[in-house]
Amino acid sequence: MATSQASSLETFTILQTTPSARAARIFGSRLAHTHAFAPAGERIFGEEPPTFAARFGHLGAMGSALLPMAAQGSQPRRFGEFYAEDRLLPYVKAARANGSFGPADAEAIDRLAERLRDGHFDAPQPRLVHTDAALLHGDLWSGNVLWARADAVMDGGGSSSYGSPAYPGLVGRGAADSEAVGVLIDPACHGGHAESDLAQLNVFAAPFVEEIYAGYQEASPLAEGWQERVGLHQLHMLIVHAALFGGSYGPQTIRAARRYL
């Protein structure tokens, strides 16, 4: 338990286990339903979570990199406009400063941003998503998916072994007590394209990623050509790494970007 004068935060340990192909497929299906969650009936690209601005303003974070957010009720943008302006271009300056981008590299990102703004890579959301933007985790690399035994995080009544409400949604969803379930941590939640979360899972090779994709497709089929857009949707995570850590992330980012020029 962590406490301060004004508030408290209760946490519990997630005991991890080895994932399986079946667990990955179930995780993919549940991720599809998470992306489609929209109680307000609308969501724009870049939209921040409810009440976010009151505490943090309109800037989120991905590690130590700032993440521009759009206020609820802002002017809607297409995917390409949002992705260029808020998920690629803000990180070029830092990548130049640490030497991982040269002038030609920055120019390549600018050219790609123009293609994005022109709508070349706009594509429909998966079938279950009925809003402009899906509800993204936003930083869905493999380390932000923990695989835990179902009975380590919930009991049959939907409570954890620590006595707090945990994951009642797992009940009746096909997760046996001894089976691994995917638990999301450390989100950078915002409205975006569902393909971005899926692509980020494979930046650092999530286990059974093809099974995750298969489970997702069964629940919410992706738009035609999604495989060709995976590299594009990985660019945000790559350019953030180039801006934060430099080194080989710069050339890796530019190689991926040039595929779409």
Regions found by a protein language model. Give the residues of each.
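Hydrophobic alpha-helical segments that form the core
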Residues: 231-239
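Active-site catalytic-loop/activation-segment of kinase and kinase-like phosphoryl-transfer enzymes
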Residues: 53-120
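Active-site Asp-x-Gly
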Residues: 75, 79-84, 93, 129-135, ...
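ATP/Mg2+ or Mg2+-diphosphate-binding catalytic cores
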Residues: 165, 241-261
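ATP-binding pocket architecture of kinase catalytic cores
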Residues: 1-77, 81, 158-160
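Phosphate/dinucleotide-binding and metal-coordinating scaffold of catalytic cores
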Residues: 19-26, 107-116, 161-164, 180, ...
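A general structural signal marking secondary-structure boundaries and capping sites
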Residues: 35-45, 95, 120, 124, ...
